[in-house]
Curated annotation (Swiss-Prot):
Residues 1-13 have a biased composition (Low complexity). It holds the Pfam family MFS_1. It is found in: Golgi apparatus; Membrane. This is Uncharacterized MFS-type transporter C330.07c. Residues 1-23 are annotated as: Disordered. It comes from the Eukaryota. GO terms for molecular function: transmembrane transporter activity. It comes from Schizosaccharomyces pombe (strain 972 / ATCC 24843). Disulfide bonds: none annotated. Its main location: Golgi.
């Protein structure tokens, strides 16, 4: 075909296209389409030309309802502010306070009591620290006893509370009878029985952060209240031991004397506490609907396993607990020895030293319990650990140059107690927000293991402070804290609050 012919054919095609494009387009309209057009027309007139005030209100309500349907909504946790019965919270916190009183009541007189029976300062530190090691050994049997299968995932907190009361009653009894028997190891056996009672340290932390009892928004607050109860216990215990020792210093009675009187008082307090919880403690258990949901949760095979990241998190939390309580218990065990050599303090004065410090720190811990409303757990940990490290570092410098006035030492000791108390408060709360609920019990146990080991080894090192040397002991505390602080900074991003 020639080019002219090809161009002619193209021109004819373009003319036909132009005629087609210029023709009007017709659509087949059905009755359904007409109904849609009428509906759109009515809605346009309704929204655009209202005639009455009632019509205006109707238009506004319709617009707001349509608008709200376009706004994305997110599920709200209705149980975020849930709390268990207040009377039960009170009993748990009282148990925490009394447990710490039983642990610390021997601090002012432990060294002199063991020396009167032929012991040493290191043995005195063992007497103070051995109970928490025993509590670690009895932790698993207590878990089995408090978490039967019939509880459907709930923990029966009443059981460990009663067991702890019995253990403390008999532990204090044997501790008191050691002087009459003139057998130093009866002191140790009595403190070991106290250790069975100290298994409740786990349940204090667990109750205040239990996902089945406490809402997410309340966990850090209750955990800090538990720390406050512990602080008050460490205040009341040494004060009680010191003041009663001074009141009975001239007693020649082999049963009721300066070494045993405080333990007798604690025995009577535990007996009264046990009778009270039997009648007034309110246990929270699963109802029928919760039993069904709990059974489904237990049968779920798709629950996430503990990842390596979460395993490292658990190790880190246990490390924080160990180092914080190692330093606190080491300092407390060394108070009567350290102040006795530097400032010639007796048992009464060293007990007042510890008690006054706790009394001053307690209001600040109470005020800090409200920080969880504005700060994340990691921020609270960062600030608390920093204060503790700062106090220990200054103490190391002043002790090395032998220029440590009593007032300065008191301030540094109080600052260290406050910092580490606040820094270790959110550990269980943080784990409950980071881990799947399946692993919450594991987190509580891991943290409690760190606390128990630190109480034992910290008390032994504190009792042997002059065998280690004061600079060596303080340097050990500072070095351990520096390591965990660097780990906290390294893990900062992964500790951001999250829920499951």
């Amino acid at each position: 075909m020639e080019p002219s012919q090809r161009s002619g054919s193209f021109s004819s095609i373009s003319r036909r296209r132009s005629r087609v494009d210029s023709r009007p387009t017709y659509f087949k309209v059905t009755s359904k389409d007409l109904g849609f057009v009428d509906q759109v027309s009515e809605e346009y007139e309704f929204y655009t030309y209202p005639k009455k005030a009632s019509e205006v209100e109707s238009v506004t309500e319709t617009f707001q309802s349509n608008r709200s349907s376009l706004v994305p909504t997110y599920p709200v946790d209705e149980n975020a502010n849930k709390l268990p019965p207040k009377v039960s919270i009170a009993f748990i916190l009282i148990n925490s306070l009394m447990s710490d009183m039983s642990l610390a009541v021997a601090l002012p007189t432990s060294a002199s009591y063991t020396q009167s029976l032929g012991g040493t300062n290191a043995f005195s530190g063992l007497v103070i620290g051995i109970p928490t090691l025993i509590s670690l050994i009895f932790l698993y049997p207590m878990l089995c006893f408090a978490n039967p299968k019939s509880a459907n995932g709930y923990t029966l907190y009443f059981r460990p509370m009663v067991v702890s009361s019995f253990a403390h009653i008999f532990g204090h009894l044997l501790y008191c009878m050691a002087y009459r028997a003139n057998w130093i190891y009866l002191i140790l056996i009595g403190r070991m029985l106290n250790g069975i009672g100290f298994t409740t340290f786990l349940y204090h932390k667990k109750y205040t952060t239990d996902k089945l009892l406490v809402g997410q928004n309340r966990r850090t607050f209750l955990a800090t209240m538990n720390i406050l109860a512990q602080t008050l216990g460490f205040m009341a215990g040494p004060f009680l031991g010191g003041i009663l020792a001074k009141a009975t210093i001239h007693s020649k009675n082999a049963v009721w004397n300066q070494y045993t009187v405080a333990s007798w008082v604690m025995l009577f307090m535990w007996f009264f506490y046990m009778l009270t919880i039997i009648f007034f403690f309110k246990e929270v258990t699963a109802d029928k609907s919760e039993k069904v949901s709990q059974q489904k949760e237990n049968d779920d095979e798709d629950r996430p396993k503990l990842s390596w990241k979460h395993k490292f998190l658990l190790f880190f939390l246990a490390e924080v607990a160990f180092i914080a309580y190692f330093t606190v218990n080491g300092y407390q065990a060394s108070i009567s020895i350290y102040t006795g050599k530097l400032y010639n303090y007796d048992a009464f004065q060293s007990g007042n030293f510890i008690a006054l410090s706790a009394l001053i720190v307690a209001p600040f811990i109470l005020a800090s319990s409200f920080l969880s409303r504005w700060l994340e757990d990691r921020h609270i940990m960062l600030g608390g650990l920093f204060l503790g490290i700062l106090a220990v570092a200054i103490h190391l410098v002043l002790d090395a140059v032998h220029k440590l006035p009593m007032q300065v030492y008191f301030f540094l000791y109080s600052l260290m107690i406050y910092g580490y108390s606040i820094g270790s408060a959110p550990l269980i709360s943080l784990s409950s927000k980071q881990l799947h609920p399946r692993h919450h019990n594991t987190a509580s146990i891991v943290v409690q293991v760190g606390v128990s080991l630190s109480n034992t080894f910290g008390s032994i090192c504190g009792g042997a402070i002059y065998n280690i040397t004061t600079v060596g002991f303080i340097s050990l505390c500072l070095g351990l804290a520096a390591v965990v602080y660097m780990q906290l900074i390294f893990m900062w991003g992964s500790l951001k609050c999250k829920t499951h």
